[in-house]
Amino acid sequence: MIKEVIVVEGRADEARIRACRIEADTIRTDGFNLLPHTLEAIRAAYERRGIIILTDPDGAGERIRKYLTDKFPLAKHAFVPRKEAIANDDLGIEQANRDSILRALEQARCLQFEPQYEFTLADLSENGLNGTTDASERRSFVGAKLGIGYGNAKQFLRRLNGYGVTRDEWNAALAALNEG
């Protein structure tokens, strides 16, 4: 049983977690329709057990994640890569397979109050993650390897520093990128 409560967007996401036989309690936000009783349930879970935010890898999911992060700064974050959350012309956690969801939960990270400033835009540029025609795909791959999700260059840099990614993790992800 996962200690933290998993916060998902909708009923289909909850059903997917159950269908994958992941032993965890969930709370759904019903999209961005966060009613007071839902926020109170999330707050109670956050204070008692901790929460893992697992939203869809799309714009709406990122807005919900940001809103919840502002309210619950010590929440953990799990990211399923976009390419692993697409099926039947639909994008969402409910489309992801069990392995993708488990990997995202295993790699869940907490934002740090004192973000490190280990990485700069130069690191991204030197490794083809910014300013190249395939930078977006490269960031997507590295983000999936690191468990921090996809973002544009500026967002990606914030995640690298904010989620405490180490140089060793960075180097291993780049090595995997360059091998593939």
Q: Over which residues does each language-model region extend?
A:
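Acidic, glycine-rich catalytic loops of TOPRIM or P-loop NTPase phosphate-binding modules used
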Residues: 4-6, 11-15, 19-48
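Charged, alpha-helix-enriched surfaces in structured cytosolic catalytic cores
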Residues: 59, 63, 96-100, 133, ...
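C-terminal, charge/polar-rich interaction regions
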Residues: 103, 110-180
